[in-house]
Structure formats: structure tokens, C-alpha cells
Curated annotation (Swiss-Prot):
<dbReference type="InterPro" id="IPR024051">
    <property type="entry name" value="AICAR_Tfase_dup_dom_sf"/>
</dbReference>
<dbReference type="InterPro" id="IPR002695">
    <property type="entry name" value="PurH-like"/>
</dbReference>
<dbReference type="GO" id="GO:0005829">
    <property type="term" value="C:cytosol"/>
</dbReference>
<dbReference type="InterPro" id="IPR011607">
    <property type="entry name" value="MGS-like_dom"/>
</dbReference>
<dbReference type="GO" id="GO:0006189">
    <property type="term" value="P:'de novo' IMP biosynthetic process"/>
</dbReference>
<comment type="similarity">
    <text>Belongs to the PurH family.</text>
</comment>
<dbReference type="GO" id="GO:0003937">
    <property type="term" value="F:IMP cyclohydrolase activity"/>
</dbReference>
<dbReference type="InterPro" id="IPR036914">
    <property type="entry name" value="MGS-like_dom_sf"/>
</dbReference>
<dbReference type="GO" id="GO:0004643">
    <property type="term" value="F:phosphoribosylaminoimidazolecarboxamide formyltransferase activity"/>
</dbReference>
<keyword id="KW-0378">Hydrolase</keyword>
<dbReference type="Pfam" id="PF01808">
    <property type="entry name" value="AICARFT_IMPCHas"/>
</dbReference>
<dbReference type="Pfam" id="PF02142">
    <property type="entry name" value="MGS"/>
</dbReference>
<keyword id="KW-0808">Transferase</keyword>
<feature type="domain" description="MGS-like">
    <location>
        <begin position="1"/>
        <end position="145"/>
    </location>
</feature>
<dbReference type="InterPro" id="IPR016193">
    <property type="entry name" value="Cytidine_deaminase-like"/>
</dbReference>
<keyword id="KW-0511">Multifunctional enzyme</keyword>
<keyword id="KW-0658">Purine biosynthesis</keyword>
Length: 515
């Protein structure tokens, strides 16, 4: 009995050669619509789908394959006599191979001019139904959804006249992943259209971006996935201009870096980062000076770190960066001379280019945190804050220079691991205490790091001070200005201590924990 294949593809890459090889192997080919036209024009003889169903395509192609003659031919078990008899009694011919890819729903909704009606029309119904029928019956039917699998299937058919069960099972698993992702994307689109903020089912889909050598540690397996609807301002979308493949830790650190830099749009800024904590932030009127400040902030910790710049990297800045061992540099662009300098004898230095004009769209994405057996979902900490809403709670008002420095410090503290303390002036970080289990411990670390630069410095805390001992430490170090959220039941104790030492202190009313 001649074996039959059903081919209906929107992505026609490789399909002509595939179909010709099938014909050479003696297969009959059933086809639909544009695929049939393409095959016929290439000289590949095909059977029209309506010759199999006995019904014409109708309703603008919405109904063409949803028919017992198709699904019976796919679902009939070859090892069950009653199935084969039912097929014979109803003149249903078996289908042994299905090659289908789906309407381009993803590509459609990514179009800037897409309409709701156009998106709906690009939801495939018949394709997923046939794929699922064939995949369910993979004991007998080979199902192909990816042109990358054409060669494997043809090779096995040529060698043995059929594919192996292992191949059919692998391809069936691929199909179920494919249709699940396709439906998840549709669900995501409709959920956004109706504005459902807390859906009872969370369906999101990601595509494999990179198979990684290992994870956070060598004993951990890891892979990098990118959202099916990619975000332009993302490490997954960054253009790599030089260097080795990004590691798991590189990606996490780089992601933290591009999140931090979003808050420093107004002036040229350079941020150095290590283990997802900023170790140096510098702002200036030009990017070269901003680099000087970021480097000076902590010339030890920057070694082996990541640097992100929010302006084009010029030759002067590149010359200063080149001698420093860095893992990654990220910027919106690089001058030709700067790129030549940075890559000279630095084949491993990872240099990434990222469209900073797409930052705003990245801020609306939800954050996902995996826990054992569950997933936490939250908005990003991108609340708009206006310094005019802040409250000076001490007798002394901040000077103009202190006010500028406090605003800078408040931007920087948001990305320090809790309990987080940062000491800055008005253009660079000076000391950082991160990740301590008590706040006064973070205060002491930040002071120790900044001890030679405390004149005119200010201090920011990501959460309230629970006790006045923190204020005493700050005052003893010579820091004169503090910014913190407030909100402790002992706030008045801290205010009294600040007044006693002539400090100025601002309450913002907004906490910035980061775990």
C-alpha cells in the first residue's frame, strides 16, 4: 500500500526538496492552499485536500482539514483491528506522515500595524488539531513541525522505509511543546487585550536562546531562554560585538546592570557591578569623566566586573577602560576607534550593544521568582518618585549640594542587596554595605569603605532604621545627611538622634528592598 503524507506549511523553507524526496521514495502527498500551489509549481504532484474530504475549503479557509477523513486517517491505531475496520467501512485512507507549521500568529502580533481582527485571523485551528492527532498516534504516524527535522526523517525513510519509534516519539514531544507554546502565546495576547491582571492560569512561553556550559556553579546544568515575544532592551536581545559566550553568572550580572542604568537617564553615567551589586556609579557631563568617577569609587572591586555606560563609548573612554580586566562592557553604541581599542588583544572581553531607547518598554514586564513548587510574580520596582513629595523630618534642611547628592544616592540604593546602605557625594558612590542581616552592620561596612571620602558625603538606606544606633554610627563618621523611607515605630528616636547631631534627614515614604 502506498504511504501518504499530508503537507501544509506556512514556512516553506526546504519543503520543495523534502516533498520531491518523498515522491522519489514512492509516497503520495496530500496538500492544502498555498502549499499545494507551491508544490505543484515545482513539479511535485499532489492530492488536493478537498479530494480527500469530499468538501471544498470554505469560510475563507477556516474550514478545510477538520474532517473525519483527515483525523480518522491520522488517529486510527494500526494495531487495533476495530480501528482499521472502521477506517475501511468509512472509506478513510490512512495518513502516515504529517508536515505542518502553523499560521504566523507571533509574527503577526509583533507587526506595528497589527489589528485585533488580523491577530484573530492568524490563529491556526486546523493545523494544531492535525499536529495533535498525529502526535497522539506517534506509534504509527510521523509528525514534523520543524524544517530542521526534514533531513532526519528523509534519512530514516530512505534507509528503512519508516522512521524509528524513538524518532517519532521525539518529534511528537516537540509537537506538543510547539502547540502548547503556540496556545500560550495566544492566551498571553488575549489576557493582555482584556486587561486581566491576575489570571487564574499563568501561561508564558520562552524559546531556547543558548545552551549553557553550566549554571551558577560548574555542578549545575543551565540554559538561557528568551521570551517568545522578545523585549528589545534585554540581554537576550543584545548584539554581541566581541568576546566569549556569555555565562550564566554573566547574564544575571548584566541584567542587573541594565536595570540599574535605566534610572540614570538625565546625565552621562557609568555603573560598575559585581555579583549583582553596584560597586561604582559615576555621573558627569561627559562619559569619560563618568568612567573616572565609577572607577575611582572602587578600583579593587571593579576587577573582573561588568560595566554599563548610557552614552556612546568614545576613544578616550575606551583607552582608560582597556587596561582594566572586565568581563562585560554594555553600551548603546561604540565609536569605530573605541571598538578597535577595546578589542585589541582582548578576544575574550564580552562587548554588548543594546538599544537604550527601548528602556521604557522593559519596565512594564513582570518579574518572576522561582520557589520550590511555585512561582512568585510581581511588578518591577519602578515606581515614579518626585523629590517634592519627600519630607524633611529634621530641624536642619539639606543644602542644595546635599539635596542633589541625596537624590543621586536614592537612585543608587534601589539596586543594593538588602539590608542596603550606600554613601555617595553628588556624582559618585563612595561606600556600600550590602546583604547584611542587620542594618547597622551594613552601615559600618559602607562607612569603612568610604572612610577617606566622608567630607560632604550623604547616606541612603533602602529601608527604615529600626533603632537610633544607626544614626549614631552615621554621625560619628561625619556624614551629615541621610535619606531613608521612614516607617519604623521608632522613627522619632532616629529623628531625635539626627537633630542632636545636627544632621538633616529625608523620609521618602518608599521602601526599596532587594533580595
Amino acid at each position: 500500500m502506498t504511504k501518504r503524507a499530508l503537507i501544509s506549511v506556512s514556512d516553506k523553507s526546504g519543503i520543495i526538496d523534502f516533498a520531491k524526496e518523498l515522491k522519489n521514495l514512492g509516497w503520495d502527498i496530500i496538500s492544502t492552499g498555498g502549499t499545494k500551489v507551491a508544490l505543484d509549481n515545482a513539479g511535485v504532484e499532489t492530492i488536493a485536500i478537498d479530494d480527500v474530504t469530499g468538501f471544498p475549503e470554505m469560510m475563507d479557509g477556516r474550514v478545510k482539514t477538520l474532517h473525519p477523513n483527515i483525523h480518522g486517517g491520522l488517529l486510527a491505531r494500526r494495531d487495533v483491528d476495530s480501528h482499521l475496520q472502521a477506517a475501511k467501512d468509512n472509506n478513510i485512507e490512512l495518513i502516515d506522515l504529517v508536515v505542518i507549521n502553523l499560521y504566523p500568529f507571533k509574527e503577526t502580533i509583533l507587526r506595528p500595524d497589527v489589528t485585533y481582527d488580523l491577530a484573530v485571523e492568524n490563529i491556526d485551528i486546523g493545523g494544531p488539531s492535525m499536529l495533535r492527532s498525529a502526535a497522539k498516534n506517534h506509534a504509527s504516524v510521523t509528525v514534523v513541525v520543524d524544517p530542521a527535522d526534514y533531513a532526519t526523517v528523509l534519512g530514516e525513510l530512505a534507509d528503512a522505509g519508516q522512521t524509528t519509534f524513538e524518532t517519532r516519539q521525539r518529534l511528537a514531544a516537540k509537537v506538543f511543546r510547539h502547540t502548547a507554546a503556540y496556545d500560550a502565546l495566544i492566551a498571553e495576547y488575549f489576557t493582555a487585550q482584556v486587561g486581566e491582571a491576575k489570571p487564574e492560569k499563568l501561561t508564558i512561553t520562552y524559546d531556547l536562546k543558548q545552551a549553557m556550559r553550566y549554571g551558577e556553579n560548574p555542578q549545575q546544568d543551565a540554559d538561557f531562554y528568551q521570551k517568545a515575544l522578545p523585549t528589545d532592551y534585554s540581554i537576550a536581545s543584545a548584539k554581541q560585538l566581541n568576546g566569549k559566550e556569555l555565562s550564566f553568572n554573566n547574564i544575571r550580572d548584566a541584567d542587573a546592570a541594565i536595570r540599574i542604568i535605566r534610572d540614570f537617564k538625565d546625565r552621562p553615567t557609568v555603573i560598575a557591578l559585581k555579583h549583582m551589586n553596584p560597586c561604582g556609579i559615576g555621573q558627569a557631563d561627559d562619559i569619560e569623566t563618568a568612567w573616572d568617577y565609577a572607577y575611582e569609587a572602587d578600583p579593587v572591586s571593579i576587577f573582573g566586573g561588568i560595566v554599563v555606560l548610557n552614552r556612546e563609548v568614545d576613544a578616550a573612554t575606551a583607552k582608560k577602560m582597556h587596561p582594566i580586566f572586565l568581563e562585560i562592557i554594555i553600551a548603546p553604541s561604540y565609536s569605530e576607534e573605541a571598538l578597535a581599542i577595546l578589542t585589541n588583544k582582548k578576544k575574550n572581553l564580552r562587548i554588548l550593544e543594546l538599544p537604550f531607547d527601548a528602556q521604557a518598554a522593559s519596565e512594564v514586564e513582570a518579574e518572576y521568582t522561582g520557589v520550590v513548587g511555585g512561582l512568585l510574580v510581581q511588578n518591577q520596582d519602578v515606581v515614579a518618585e518626585n523629590p517634592s513629595d519627600w519630607q524633611v523630618v529634621t530641624d536642619r534642611q539639606p543644602t542644595e549640594q546635599e539635596a542633589t547628592a541625596l537624590e543621586f544616592a536614592w537612585k543608587a540604593i534601589k539596586y543594593v542587596k538588602s539590608n542596603g546602605i550606600i554613601i555617595t557625594n553628588d556624582h559618585m558612590t563612595l561606600g556600600l554595605g550590602a546583604g547584611q542581616t542587620n542594618r547597622v552592620g551594613s552601615v559600618k561596612i559602607a562607612i569603612e569603605q568610604a572612610k577617606d571620602h566622608l567630607d560632604g558625603a550623604v547616606l541612603a538606606s533602602d529601608a527604615f532604621f529600626p533603632f537610633a544606633d544607626n544614626i549614631e554610627e552615621v554621625a560619628a563618621a561625619g556624614v551629615k545627611a541621610i535619606i531613608q523611607p521612614g516607617g519604623s515605630v521608632r522613627d522619632q528616636d532616629s529623628i531625635d538622634a539626627a537633630n542632636k547631631h545636627g544632621l538633616t534627614m529625608i523620609f521618602t515614604g518608599v521602601r526599596h528592598f532587594r533580595h
